[in-house]
Amino acid sequence: MVTPVTWMDNPIEIYVNDSVWVPGPIDDRCPAKPEEEGMMINISIGYRYPPICLGRAPGCLMPAVQNWLVEVPTVSPISRFTYHMVSGMSLRPRVNYLQDFSYQRSLKFRPKGKPCPKEIPKESKNTEVLVWEECVANSAVILQNNEFGTIIDWAPRGQFYHNCSGQTQSCPSAQVSPAVDSDLTESLDKHKHKKLQSFYPWEWGEKRISTPRPKIVSPVSGPEHPELWRLTVASHHIRIWSGNQTLETRDCKPFYTIDLNSSLTVPLQSCVKPPYMLVVGNIVIKPDSQTITCENCRLLSCIDSTFNWQHRILLVRAREGVWIPVSMDRPWEASPSVHILTEVLKGVLNRSKRFIFTLIAVIMGLIAVTATAAVAGVALHSSVQSVNFVNDWQKNSTRLWNSQSSIDQKLANQINDLRQTVIWMGDRLMSLEHRFQLQCDWNTSDFCITPQIYNESEHHWDMVRRHLQGREDNLTLDISKLKEQIFEASKAHLNLVPGTEAIAGVADGLANLNPVTWVKTIGSTTIINLILILVCLFCLLLVCRCTQQLRRDSDHRERAMMTMAVLSKRKGGNVGKSKRDQIVTVSV
């Protein structure tokens, strides 16, 4: 889940291990996790604005060697000037100077700042002192001008050239020793002596020790990125030169010679810190589809002199989040209290005798859940304020250091860490602010499921896929509009207390169980109820009379049956008896 750093983003922090030769924040403890350095990765991501890429590939800024020169006090009577020069990897211009229309177009993008001086900076004899000072050159150079955009740089690009002022003969005014060499590392490794000779005086143009500050001006205009140079200069060691310019006479004419020698190189290392990383490998940028692909690339946080410029460097950062449609197997609920209340009511509404007691228990549960949420909110607020603890720790940690140089070094490291931490915490706070503005489903903590209904006709899956790749052109998901819709829906939910609907259902259930309501209903229909009662009483009386008649008939039948049974048993048993006896017997 990474996204490329583009030319429209603000400059990022790139740390160096030696601030004497390279300006910028210093940190010599990188990488933070050496065991994870160089992890393999395959990426296929999209972009909206042109990404920042360094290397020999379309869409990337090309590397080259650049020279910076300062003048020191002359120590020889035959020397016109004594120089110290620094050579290192930099950004290669496509065109040395913008001419005519291009030059006029660049003037409107000229940054604010003091112009570069007309004289070479004069420094001390100590070659270990190099003062960097930002200034704006008289003209800009083009670093890139193609389908990926136009990138220019207003930093000075010094070089030796012939001073033809006052010369009567033909004078080659063209640059003899350009500031940028095309052989890259060979000029830093093999060539340890440089000698320039001419019948014309040598001059150094663009007189200032200033770092490149590229910026995009087309198709959009973005901020300057002076931090990129710290990556290129660390890809190879810098070389320190010392020399002078002497004046001799040859063929009765003044003859000027510049001798520069080098015996000192300085290795460097530049690093980025989370959430930023460097993807190094065969990076391919496709402007038509606005995608970036890289197979079998390495994920690095530092660049040093072992870097091979056959590869390319892509700056990336971790994404804050993505928006994807999901399906749920249950209704969306904003809080666990509402879920608990709903589940309890399902089993309670059918058991009215325990309803009141259970309702009280549920309300107590709601209070407990609310209290827990309040405690969690206080804990979160305290965690956000922990930067004060970091600051206090940074101030008190000086007691552990033994030497003044170590104190300076570690203080600088702590300040850089604190600055990076503040930047990271700012991003996290913005993310938390957005999260708090959203109404999320309570049962998902790692991500937020909003109540926004996914409209497949408006945002089909191809648009979602492009959004996941990071592409945000006109054909992709308009994430800003979607966020606005979700925030509006969340605000509508925030107007109601969570669980209002469930509480309203509880109130309705209580009203239905209220006997007073029943009495009022009966009182409003008294006549109808009286008629119904009379009809019921008449039916009951009729049933009782029928029941009694049936009971009497049943008794007569039983007696007749009993008499018949007795007579049948005595049949033939009364012969020889008198008639009177027979009658008595029957009567009995």
UniProtKB/Swiss-Prot annotation:
One of its GO terms (cellular component) is plasma membrane. The chain crosses the membrane at residues 522-542. It is found in: Virion. Pfam families: GP41 (PF00517), HERV-K_env_2 (PF13804). The keyword Transmembrane helix applies. The record marks R354, F355 as: Cleavage. Keywords: Cell membrane, Cleavage on pair of basic residues, Disulfide bond, ERV, Membrane, Transmembrane, Transmembrane helix, Transposable element, Viral envelope protein, Virion. Its main location: virion. GO terms for molecular function: structural molecule activity. Residues 355-375 are annotated as: Fusion peptide. Disulfide bonds: none annotated. Specific enzymatic cleavages in vivo yield the mature SU and TM proteins. The keyword Disulfide bond applies. Coiled coil: none annotated. Expressed in lung, placenta, testis and peripheral blood lymphocytes. It comes from the Eukaryota. Retroviral envelope proteins mediate receptor recognition and membrane fusion during early infection. Endogenous envelope proteins may have kept, lost or modified their original function during evolution. SU mediates receptor recognition. Belongs to the beta type-B retroviral envelope protein family. HERV class-II K(HML-2) env subfamily. This envelope protein is encoded by a human specific provirus. Has a type 1 genome. The HERV-K(HML-2) family contains type 1 and type 2 genomes depending on the absence or presence of 292 nucleotides at the 5'-end of the env gene resulting in Env proteins of distinct sizes. Despite their overall retroviral envelope structure HERV-K(HML-2) type 1 envelope proteins lack a predictable signal sequence. Subgenomic RNA transcripts coding for full-length envelope proteins have been detected for both type of genomes. The surface (SU) and transmembrane (TM) proteins form a heterodimer. SU and TM are attached by noncovalent interactions or by a labile interchain disulfide bond. This is Endogenous retrovirus group K member 7 Env polyprotein. It comes from Homo sapiens. The gene is ERVK-7.
